[in-house]
Amino acid sequence: MSGNTGERSFADIITSIRYWVIHSITIPSLFIAGWLFVSTGLAYDVFGSPRPNEYFTESRQEVPLVTGRFDPLEQLDEFTRSF
């Protein structure tokens, strides 16, 4: 026989006014913060990924594809020199 841990049931939590007051503020705030993080370009800076206009430069229009099985580091060095 299991004992009572003193925790509220899930149904009791999601039907309470306090739950919805807190979450009606936090869920939209997280959505807006994520949208601003991506739309301002901060996500590109934080994660180091190239922006959409930086994938192809004037000097390099081909896809940077590593084809050498035994010298991939040399090919990667060539690709990164063009950045």
From Swiss-Prot:
NCBIfam families linked: cyt_b559_alpha (TIGR01332)
Name of the protein described by the UniProt record: Cytochrome b559 subunit alpha
Membrane topology summary: Single-pass membrane protein
Cited Pfam families: Cytochrom_B559 (PF00283), Cytochrom_B559a (PF00284)
Highest taxon listed in the record's lineage: Eukaryota
Membrane-spanning ranges: 21-35
Molecular function GO labels: electron transfer activity; heme binding; iron ion binding
SUPFAM superfamilies in the record: Cytochrome b559 subunits (SSF161045)
A GO BP entry: photosynthetic electron transport chain
Keyword NAD: no
Keywords attached to this entry: Chloroplast, Electron transport, Heme, Iron, Membrane, Metal-binding, Photosynthesis, Photosystem II, Plastid, Thylakoid, Transmembrane, Transmembrane helix, Transport
GO cellular component labels: chloroplast thylakoid membrane; photosystem II reaction center
Annotated gene: psbE
Cofactor note: With its partner (PsbF) binds heme. PSII binds additional chlorophylls, carotenoids and specific lipids.
Species for this entry: Pinus thunbergii
